[in-house]
Amino acid sequence: MTSPQNSSTQNSQQHNTPLAELDPQVAEAIAGELRRQRTTLEMIASENFVPRAVLQAQGSVLTNKYAEGYPGRRYYGGCEHVDVIEDLARDRAKQVFGAEFANVQPHAGAQANAAVLMSLANPGDKIMGLSLAHGGHLTHGMHLNFSGKLYEVAAYEVDPETFRLDMDKIREQAIAEKPQVLIAGWSAYPRHQDFAAFKSIADEVGAKLWVDMAHFAGLVAADLHPSPVPHADVVSTTVHKTLGGPRSGMILAKQEYAKKLNSSVFPGQQGGPLMHAVAAKAVAMKVAQTDEFRDRQQRTLEGAKILAERLNAQDTKDAGVQVLTGGTDVHLVLVDLRNSQLDGQQGEDLLHEVGITVNRNAVPFDPRPPMVTSGLRIGTSALASRGLDTKAFTEVADIIGTALAGNADIAALRARVDKIAADFPLYEGLEDWKLV
């Protein structure tokens, strides 16, 4: 039998043993992921590379602290330091987006969205958002998601000719459907949305306007994308896409919704907040107020436009590759492969061979199943965070265009990717297994 003293010593040893010694299997998997991120080009539109300071905050001792409630009104003792952190995160979020209210506790975007719907509608009420098949999100009413199970759903779609939103048709549909909540925002739509028009429609039919800006929040923070905050009753977002912060969610709103939203997050959706993630959000919101952040967002936009222009070239057109809507206003390009020899899965696999990570994505009116799809969603945020400039983005765009045009020399394209990855190193100085 182990004596109490020996047990205590053993526990102390475990608590001070580095990850590589305590769990080499997990350490090696993390090391492998870091090597993958360093040696490939990350172009999944919902991914980014966080600053090292965000890694440090999220990997801190704050993971030990339970803090149910809100600053000054906790259900646990010892919250004096996490109160400071949450206040910083809330205040900075309000400053960045010009919002009256912020809740920074949602664990993820889906939890933020669930809390928004809980605040604005009752189960069985009607909500109206962009169809998932046309670029919306699961939480905007998809039938297998909580939003599709708890609420009656009316979905609007893009125009079949232009693949853009037709606000006149959305208005007609809203008048006919009379939703309690009108939803703007998207997960795969490459153009600006008219938030003022959405608000006008919502007011006309007596609906609340909720905008999910998860994908384009970083561009909004940098004043490079129209802000939904002045128009919407409530705005939700993730923090890890264009914002480049930790994987988590956040809610912004007019002050009149503060009490309902706070209650819907806690105790409505969650128990204790993840204070290490809240700290990482605070850091991300500080970063979002800098000139360097704005420059990064500018390069994100420029990179996406360079990519769209290259994919509109004659060789890709001849191969049946089409840029949906002809271009982009945001950080991503939607590629339609319906007329090419590739489906979405094959396109994703082909670029993976080259060393570029993207995701297959359904296009509007897609004839293929969701696990195959007829499209690709390609984003530029992570590469902008890595430091790529106009010249480098032009090279990346040409690699992608050449690959999708067909009959490319995969080894030669991979060599070009390797050079770009070497020219723009990631997390220099981090040991393979060490996170901070």
Curated annotation (Swiss-Prot):
Keywords: Amino-acid biosynthesis, Cytoplasm, One-carbon metabolism, Pyridoxal phosphate, Transferase. It comes from the Bacteria. One of its GO terms (cellular component) is cytosol. Its EC number is 2.1.2.1. Gene3D superfamilies: Aspartate Aminotransferase, domain 1 (3.90.1150.10), Type I PLP-dependent aspartate aminotransferase-like (Major domain) (3.40.640.10). Pfam families: SHMT. Residues 1-18 have a biased composition (Low complexity). It is an enzyme of class 2 (transferase). CDD domains: SHMT. GO terms for biological process: glycine biosynthetic process from serine; tetrahydrofolate interconversion. The modification N6-(pyridoxal phosphate)lysine is found at residue 241. Its cofactor is pyridoxal 5'-phosphate. PROSITE patterns: SHMT (PS00096). Its main location: cytoplasm. It is found in: Cytoplasm. The keyword Transferase applies. The keyword Transferase applies. GO terms for molecular function: glycine hydroxymethyltransferase activity; pyridoxal phosphate binding. The record marks 240 as: Plays an important role in substrate specificity. Residues 1-22 are annotated as: Disordered. It catalyses: (6R)-5,10-methylene-5,6,7,8-tetrahydrofolate + glycine + H2O = (6S)-5,6,7,8-tetrahydrofolate + L-serine. (6S)-5,6,7,8-tetrahydrofolate binds at residues 132, 136-138. Belongs to the SHMT family. Homodimer. Catalyzes the reversible interconversion of serine and glycine with tetrahydrofolate (THF) serving as the one-carbon carrier. This reaction serves as the major source of one-carbon groups required for the biosynthesis of purines, thymidylate, methionine, and other important biomolecules. Also exhibits THF-independent aldolase activity toward beta-hydroxyamino acids, producing glycine and aldehydes, via a retro-aldol mechanism. This is Serine hydroxymethyltransferase. It comes from Corynebacterium jeikeium (strain K411).
